[in-house]
Amino acid sequence: MAKSSLKNLLTLVNEAKKQSPVAESFLQDYLQSIERTANSNKRKPSAHYKPSSLNCIRNMFYQIVEQEPDSSIKEAPLIGIGESGTDRHEHLQNAVIEMKKNGFACEYLDVAKYVEQKELPGIIVKGKRGIETQLFNETWNISFLCDGIIKYRGELYIIEFKTEVSRKFVTRNDVDEDHKRQAIAYSLSLGLDKIIFVYENRDTCEKK
């Protein structure tokens, strides 16, 4: 019985080895398909500044002349990292929306309605990307996505989520300097001087 079981196991192993070239071929085709989809959907940069580009004069130049600073093809791992970051943002934002239902003094405000009600000069609502709201500041030619505005314990705040690798997260004890510059652009555009940053560890989902 034991010899028969061992023989069956060896047969399965050998069959798996025979199939491995097919599996490897599938994997390579799968990765290439991901890359082709992502790269064919690449949008031409708009001639507007983005808060994240304000930290680098070079990036600002490429943005305003509608050029990609790096025209290389994106590879599947980097595409996946970007997609996972977008997915996490949606989960993090949905968790904020649930806070009021769970008895906490926190209300997630509709950014588009807030902009319209406040009649903020030069601020145009371009649309939605999931829960995020795409805004454009005509005065400064800045286009940006707002994670959200919340009313927490009676005060209004812009809320911004950031995900990062463990190496950065474990030493995180303050808002990143680059993110502070982004916050200034958001604050001046929306007329709100209070911003809450939530950082999440991509590997463990811990938060600070």
PLM region descriptions:
Residues 1-158, 165-167, 171:
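Metal-dependent nuclease catalytic cores that hydrolyze phosphodiester bonds in DNA/RNA
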Residues 9, 14-22, 171-176, 188-208:
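Metal-dependent nuclease catalytic regions and adjoining charged, substrate-binding loops involved
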Residues 87, 91, 181-185, 189:
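Short amphipathic alpha-helical face segments that pack within enzyme cores
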Residues 97-100, 163, 188-194:
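Hydrophobic/aromatic-lined pockets within catalytic cores
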Residues 140-141, 175-179:
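Short, glycine/acidic-rich beta->alpha junctions
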Residues 162-165, 201-203:
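A short beta-strand motif that forms part of the nucleic acid-binding face
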